[in-house]
């Protein structure tokens, strides 16, 4: 990656940030994302397209730690190429209802061999007893001390060919709680809830399950626009990303904080500290963090894909 200095364009952007009520930390994050300090470790120039993200909030590129989430639909993945591209973590689909993802074992072993921090997720099937679902997940996703916390993918499934059951808010919260508690008991780590805008608004916006970190989907707006003041750990900002080593599209995600906070999360994953706010600017990075971190590529949401 070529070294970059502070251009007039960067200075103009920083002046605009300073004039907005986002605080000094946002300016620091903007400097971080601009690559001040001589560039970062990525082998190729990474380009973001922010035209789909509106408002004065931070853009995906303003966060230094980026990752992907994958399933069988990504096919055969060259995990060494993924690692060399700068991807910092991978979420790997293990199960959906009572079925194992066909590529889970290969993806798990590949990410591990490539040195990419990785964790498994379960996609909820609302027509099966919740405890039974998680027991199937536990039979497939191994317990490993260095794995990322497990994720429960809780979203509405109105188009499912086999499960059209519309869960009530009480059912959704109760079943989700059962699954999260069993995950935590088995893996000895606080699990993470993945949620979409519609599921969150219908079931979690009233303050339910705030003891658990959340991973939010929002491909058009910053999470603060759609999820309010709820602090988030991970933001799925794109569903048609491109990453070396993966032949087609892939979901791309950002971690909420600095490299230092990411390293702390890897050591002790858990509920995000309240003082960091709702997905807003993280504390200002150090000079070494600024020099070391560069984000991933981003392109616009594809035509016909749901934008939230």
In which residue ranges do the predicted regions lie?
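Conserved beta-strand positions
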Residues: 70, 92, 152-154, 193-196, ...
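Bacterial N-terminal signal peptides that target proteins for export
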Residues: 4-23
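Aromatic-lined carbohydrate-recognition surfaces of secreted/lumenal glycan-active proteins
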Residues: 188-201
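Substrate-binding cleft of extracellular glycoside hydrolase catalytic domains
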Residues: 60-76, 92-180, 184-186
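C-terminal motif of bacterial Sec signal peptides marking the signal peptidase cleavage site
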Residues: 32-35
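Functionally critical loop-and-helix segments that line ligand-binding/catalytic clefts
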Residues: 40-70, 209-308
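Short loop/helix-cap segments at secondary-structure boundaries that form the rim of catalytic
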Residues: 77-84, 202-209, 223-231
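Hydrophobic anchor at the start of a short beta-strand
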Residues: 118, 189-191, 214
